[in-house]
Amino acid sequence: MLFWILVAILTAAVAAVLLLPLMRAAEPLPSRHSHDIEVYRDQLGELARDREAGLIGSEEAELARAEIARRMLSASAADQAVAERTPKRLLSNRLAQAFIFLCLPAVGLCLYLTTGSPGVPAQPLAARLADPGDDVNILIAKAENHLALNPQDGAGWDLLAPIYMRHGRLDDAVAAYDRAIRLLGPTPARMGGYAEALVAQAGGLVTAEAQNALQKALALDPDDPRSAFYLALGLKQEGKHAEALAAFRKLAESSPADAPWLSLVNQHIAELAAAPAGPGPAAPGDPAPGDIAAAKEMNAGDRQAMIRGMVDSLASRLKEDPANLEGWMRLVRSYVVLDQRDRAKDALHDGLRAFPATGEQGKQLLALARELGIDAGGEAE
């Protein structure tokens, strides 16, 4: 009921604003022709005075008087025509008033009932933020609004950081983890999450900053599998195959038999065990140890250019040898880092052709897609 009362009040207010100019009595404005008539009368008087003073002859005076009289009659006729049109203007005003009073509210109501939803409650932004339901984007916006007002809320940054990570907002994830660590202090989960975000931000490179965070996480919890995995991956990227193999084997031995990361660890072990002793040449699509060292010293722009080259090389390698689960996972994640989500989706589908979704390795690809917010389409069924 309140809604319709508000509608009636607003309609009346709009109608009043529109009607006021129409209802105001029209003040007669002097027309141009009325002014001309006054001028002609003055000219006749001046002509008579000139005639009496002998400044003009009688014949010239008669001719001038006839011309002025003719002009005066013409102006009078035009002024009368203007006066006759005034009732028509008043009639049009009355019609406009009737339209505003009767038709405008009716037309507006019909349009609203046809295209609107009067039975649906209003959903202003503030109300949606107060009750976001299952909308993750609204939850994120609500958390961001809260943190904008309370930037020292470490728990809020700690909660938001992994959400940013799952949605591929890697720069925001790195910043949120950094704020949480500064405000709440380091924990294995925070340091490991921070390092993982740094690795993802660098396109899969375990940078020096990420290694430092991983070592701090392991110092707090020597059994943290995530930190152990990325440190081993960093050793592999640096060409320290023997150390990387030992680290991966240690992680495999300490992991439960049903650990979701175990198959990926075993794949690294198999690759390293089959590799020749010593650093050796880097596989196509993988950075050489020298490239890793150089990347750690690069600025963000140069590192991004290097990452794009590595990603293109990795994509070419996977076309020739698609039986590489880690390669597909790296490629999908790298495209997300480069904000090329369409290519990430294509890479996911290519990977699922090599590793069907019904298998264990295909499920890992689907899990990665869900983590990064990539639509797997019919492949997930």
From Swiss-Prot:
Compartment list: Cell inner membrane
Keywords from the named record: Cell inner membrane, Cell membrane, Cytochrome c-type biogenesis, Membrane, Repeat, TPR repeat, Transmembrane, Transmembrane helix
Topology in the lipid bilayer: Multi-pass membrane protein
Keyword Protein transport among record annotations: no
Highest taxon of the lineage: Bacteria
TPR repeat locations: 154-187, 191-224, 226-258, 325-358
Transmembrane segments: 2-22, 95-115
A GO BP annotation: cytochrome complex assembly
Entry keyword annotation includes Cell wall biogenesis/degradation: no
Periplasmic side: 116-381
Any single GO CC term annotated in Swiss-Prot or TrEMBL for this entry: plasma membrane
Chief location: membrane
Function: Required for the biogenesis of c-type cytochromes. Possible subunit of a heme lyase.
Family label: Belongs to the CycH family.
The name this protein goes by in its record: Cytochrome c-type biogenesis protein CycH
Protein species of origin: Rhizobium meliloti (strain 1021)
Source taxonomy: Bacteria, Pseudomonadati, Pseudomonadota, Alphaproteobacteria, Hyphomicrobiales
